């Protein structure tokens, strides 16, 4: 019987899942919209919703709790400075998951996960030092 099994394993160890959700949530906070597989998007949504609720609280303990989950201090700064105040009057439902067809190659169902009142200017910004290093080598 499948009682009490609340989350998907996604074919990963628990440490890999935790790291993956930390990285994906940092990317989502940075770009405010990312494309991933549908099961990952559905599992990421409650993770990020809880982070936004922490940001709405705004105290030091909430910030430290968010850093322990995301592990990217710069993105936690944006979470508390931009996203927390943006959603201060909204009671949950900060994230939307839209189905985006199927991936070529393995036919995996894809999804776009984004913030509800996102800033369109954030889309397509650099993805950090990795992208800058790739351009420097070329």
UniProtKB/Swiss-Prot annotation:
GO biological process, one term: translation
Tagged with keyword Ribosomal protein: yes
Subunit annotation: Part of the 50S ribosomal subunit. Contacts protein L32.
Keyword annotations: Ribonucleoprotein, Ribosomal protein
Superkingdom of this protein's organism: Bacteria
One Pfam family cited in the UniProt record for this chain: Ribosomal_L17
GO molecular function, one term: structural constituent of ribosome
Species in which this protein is naturally found: Phenylobacterium zucineum (strain HLK1)
GO cellular component: cytosolic large ribosomal subunit
Protein's gene: rplQ
Keyword Ribosomal protein: yes
Family: Belongs to the bacterial ribosomal protein bL17 family.
Protein name: Large ribosomal subunit protein bL17
